[in-house]
Amino acid sequence: DLVAEHGEIVAVICHQRAREYPVSGGPSSCCRCVDRPDLREYAQRLVRETGYTGLAMFEFKEDGEGHPHLLEVNPRIWGTFPLTRVTGSGIPLLWAILAHNAGNGGAPIPLPEIPVPRQKKMIFAASDLMAGLGYARRGRPGQLFAALGDFLNPAVRDGLFEWGDILPGLAYYRSLITKEKRG
């Protein structure tokens, strides 16, 4: 997950999917920030060679020997984008400043010092609890206990629910409940 300007990465975090919902293949319900210099270097080469400016999410998958392979590059906001905020990476603010500066060459805002991202874990609580149940139904009860532990752990942040602005989180949870009833 990164923001770049003129072929140089301004800020980057690497995240790893821990659980997904639906468990048969869906978006992340739990992810964590990880330190992967090899993936950062790979992304930097592509960003530099293309002169890319903007947001991007590089998705890699490791083969059986642990070698990463690039699956896709999403030049847009992605589902786990809230992790950029949870980790304190500064990516949302930097992206906004770069967008402002692109259209205001005469009055650019200087980029602030880039913070070092914190190694954090994030869940989408409702879908992660349902993922835990789904994994348990598939014979992996440890994932249910992991989801419950993350739900109860105050250090693990929710990607949508914030006490200062509860409506987006409530709308998301409502949509999950109605989807579960239908299907």
Identify what each model region corresponds to.
Residues 97-183:
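Peripheral (often C-terminal) accessory segments that flank ATP-dependent C-N-forming ligase machineries
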Residues 53-65:
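A short glycine-rich, hydrophobically flanked beta-strand micro-motif that places a catalytic Asp/Glu
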Residues 1, 15, 61, 123-124:
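Residues in well-ordered beta-strands of folded domains
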Residues 1-51, 74-96:
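ATP-dependent carboxylate/phosphate-activation module, predominantly the ATP-grasp catalytic core
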